């Protein structure tokens, strides 16, 4: 029996699909019944307030806002200040004292149990401070071809646990608590999980940390007092002075860009332009290089609308200097009027995220992806570059099965003098424990994230994605290596590979170079074995819309 001359029996079997798709169509009736824990990080309440203020200011007839703006005096930013918050923890009652109200509300809805809080109050404060930092502003990873947002935490904080003999006072008002309605704002509601569920919709975050973070934990026996009350441990948060690099002016940024970009008219070099995406930081098109016939992706960004233009320069320079077969390579860039055009390789297979959420990968296919990613990481690490945001969304696939690492918005260049970074960067569910616990770190944070991504390929999502985001951070900080749902289904060499990636002790964790010699990679299938998975994922995605 044949169909258009092709024997049906000769067709390869369809790739195995996940029984329960982790994508939910826009019209699905079940979207409202999702476990709230399986949703992305909540929207930034500060951002909502900014939008509300903006809309009020442009509403017709609202003259009070304009009048208030005129009357408001100009106040310069504070400088050379030190801000201390004292938070106590009563080991007997298991309660925090002196905790800022906003933190207390978040903790109340975090699903972190009382016993967990009592077990590790320091970790609770670490994740609260990270999650709820007041000084937030949006930043973008400009070269990525999906619209991702980032929260930029500009605090410089250390948390120290010390034993004191008296109940600490209520913390002083933070210098950035300008709005009186802050305390009235309820804790952010965790938004419904989007129809494409995946890491592309979870936020990446960046938070500068102190150059020399201190974490002194002093424990002493607690004796009951006459009133049978126990002096709480004080958890002290010190905001220290931090030297900041002077910001580049718009003119300096333009001057630097002019020295980087090519001269000429890209509209003559590339044609035709087909729009494939629109994001807050720009519009993405595909086009053909007239001279070579190569299909490319072109991102057009209006520079006036970019809040952190210096990040664009950093990203272009890193991509330009680090070309590799396993990296989505930067090809060219142009200044066209007020726009910056960045030309990149185009991979039609989409991101690995679609494959892991819609299909079931076997160990040979997972090994092939891990090998290609490790080759990219070995190259970057040997050039003193840490990617810092490894996850399935940042792995792009070609229809031939090629696997390439992309999105260098948060990459870091390290020097021999600065072999460790101390910045909280990445996407929370993929973060290494040393990042969540605010320690200095090195290139092996990428190896941990690769291990989490391998779990994505097994289970369709990273560990703790179904947990409240705050509790997920707590679990990463305290549990360390996550447990697999069905470890018995994996081969011994795959389990060993995962253990090498997800080793809590950074010194024992494998490097990219070492892991490329691991036995697990020897079972890798040809890259062409990924092509049927991409076709199946695209078909499933189409059916879910």
From Swiss-Prot:
Location of region: Autoregulatory region: 70-140
Regulation: Phosphorylation of Thr-84 by OXSR1 inhibits activation. Activated by binding small G proteins. Binding of GTP-bound CDC42 or RAC1 to the autoregulatory region releases monomers from the autoinhibited dimer, and enables activation by phosphorylation of Thr-423.
Entry binding sites for ATP: 276-284, 299
Start and end residues of each stretch annotated as GTPase-binding: 75-105
Annotated positions of the Phosphotyrosine modification: 131, 142, 153, 201, 285
Cofactor: Mg(2+)
SUPFAM superfamilies: Protein kinase-like (PK-like) (SSF56112)
Compositional bias annotation for Polar residues: 152-166, 220-231
Catalysis performed (reactions): L-seryl-[protein] + ATP = O-phospho-L-seryl-[protein] + ADP + H(+); L-threonyl-[protein] + ATP = O-phospho-L-threonyl-[protein] + ADP + H(+)
Phosphoserine modification, residue list: 21, 57, 115, 144, 149, 174, 199, 204, 220, 223
Phosphothreonine modifications at: 84, 185, 212, 219, 225, 229-230, 423
First-listed, main subcellular location of the protein, grouped into a coarse class: cytoplasm
Uppermost EC category: transferase
All residue ranges annotated as the CRIB domain in the record: 75-88
Positions where N-acetylserine occurs in the chain: 2
BP-aspect Gene Ontology terms: actin cytoskeleton organization; amygdala development; apoptotic process; branching morphogenesis of an epithelial tube; cell migration; chromatin remodeling; dendrite development; dendritic spine development
Post-translational modification, as annotated: Autophosphorylated in trans, meaning that in a dimer, one kinase molecule phosphorylates the other one. Activated by autophosphorylation at Thr-423 in response to a conformation change, triggered by interaction with GTP-bound CDC42 or RAC1. Activated by phosphorylation at Thr-423 by BRSK2 and by PDPK1. Phosphorylated by JAK2 in response to PRL; this increases PAK1 kinase activity. Phosphorylated at Ser-21 by PKB/AKT; this reduces interaction with NCK1 and association with focal adhesion sites. Upon DNA damage, phosphorylated at Thr-212 and translocates to the nucleoplasm.
Protein kinase domain ranges (all copies): 270-521
Keyword Ion transport: no
Stored InterPro entries: CRIB_dom, CRIB_dom_sf, Kinase-like_dom_sf, PAK3-like, PAK_BD, Prot_kinase_dom, Protein_kinase_ATP_BS, Ser/Thr_kinase_AS
Disordered: region residues: 1-75, 150-198, 210-250
Quaternary structure and partners: Homodimer in its autoinhibited state. Active as monomer. Interacts with GIT1. Component of cytoplasmic complexes, which also contains PXN, ARHGEF7 and GIT1. Interacts with NISCH. Interacts with DVL1; mediates the formation of a DVL1, MUSK and PAK1 ternary complex involved in AChR clustering. Binds to the caspase-cleaved p110 isoform of CDC2L1 and CDC2L2, p110C, but not the full-length proteins. Interacts with ARHGEF7. Interacts tightly with GTP-bound but not GDP-bound CDC42/P21 and RAC1. Interacts with SCRIB. Interacts with PDPK1. Interacts (via kinase domain) with RAF1.
Family: Belongs to the protein kinase superfamily. STE Ser/Thr protein kinase family. STE20 subfamily.
Protein name: Serine/threonine-protein kinase PAK 1
Organism: Mus musculus
Gene name per UniProt: Pak1
